[in-house]
Swiss-Prot record:
It is an enzyme of class 2 (transferase). GO terms for cellular component: cytosol. It comes from the Bacteria. It comes from Enterobacter sp. (strain 638). The keyword Methyltransferase applies. It is found in: Cytoplasm. GO terms for molecular function: thymidylate synthase activity. It holds the Pfam family Thymidylat_synt. Homodimer. Keywords: Cytoplasm, Methyltransferase, Nucleotide biosynthesis, Transferase. Pathway: Pyrimidine metabolism; dTTP biosynthesis. (6R)-5,10-methylene-5,6,7,8-tetrahydrofolate binds at H51, D169, A263. This is Thymidylate synthase.
Length: 264
């Protein structure tokens, strides 16, 4: 994950001071891309410990179309708590858009099922896309989608994915986002009898918060270690039938965790 550290250093060296929605302040660059060959290991940051339990449960929650934090809380995952209302609701965020995008005529589109069918029946299509950025429902969401749009691509029997992330918290959020979408590629590839290819991450407003600077400098002193390996223990009948226990990470030997405040 050397390229992740290189991005942190680039933001420190070249970033522009900017105000932001949270009032915290950032150093920001615009437009950056990283490519991870998933054949070479699972891209889980090793220069600090990442909470893999949260990453897996959040993705399973998205795939169920869920937008209430009850499932996450039941599994000791608190990453969405700050944005939930008193009943645990978040509005029509990621899961709703992925699984039940509303149409003007009252129908709902299951984008995940749609792209699975495309991958199986028309893998050369250039339209294998999922979008969470529904402009008609942004004002109903507790938090507008940061990782907004992703596209799948099949070549030589390998499945690749590119994500566009319009806003990226480099220190806290990005390690989660990379691992989450890498996990999704592995799951989709297994369901479609494909090998994994590349995960390509593309960032828009790519920033470090002003209260993450000390933590960032500490992380930059650490040497990346070998990437772990993802093992999926079984192949469920559906992309929606995976369970937390189906996943195992082998060989993850990270440096200690680094705590930092979340900008809300």
């Amino acid at each position: 994950m050397k390229q992740y550290l290189e991005l942190m250093k680039k933001v420190l060296d070249e970033g522009t001071p900017k105000n932001d929605r949270t009032g915290t302040g950032t150093l920001s660059i615009f437009g950056h891309q990283m490519r991870f060959n998933l054949q070479e290991g699972f891209p889980l940051v090793t220069t600090k410990r990442c909470h893999l339990r949260s990453i897996i449960h959040e993705l399973l929650w998205f795939l169920q179309g869920d937008t209430n934090v009850a499932y996450l809380r039941e599994n000791n995952v608190s990453i969405w708590d700050e944005w939930a209302d008193e009943n645990g609701n978040l509005g029509p965020v990621y899961g709703h858009q992925w699984r039940a995008w509303p149409t003007p005529d009252g129908r709902h589109i299951d984008q995940i099922t749609t792209v699975l069918n495309q991958l199986k029946n028309d893998p050369d299509s250039r339209r294998i896309i999922v979008s969470a950025w529904n402009v008609g429902e942004l004002d109903k969401m507790a938090l507008a989608p940061c990782h907004a749009f992703f596209q799948f691509y099949v070549a030589d029997g390998k499945l690749s994915c590119q994500l566009y992330q319009r806003s990226c918290d480099v220190f806290l959020g990005l390690p989660f986002n990379i691992a989450s979408y890498a996990l999704l590629v592995h799951m989709m590839a297994q369901q479609c009898d494909l090998e994994v290819g590349d995960f390509v991450w593309t960032g828009g407003d790519t920033h470090l918060y002003s209260n993450h600077m000390e933590q960032t400098h500490l992380q930059l002193t650490r040497e990346p270690r070998a990437l772990p390996k993802l093992v999926i223990k079984r192949k469920p009948e559906s992309i929606f039938d995976y369970r937390f226990e189906d996943f195992e990470i082998e060989g993850y030997d990270p440096h200690p965790g680094i705590k930092a405040p979340v900008a809300i």
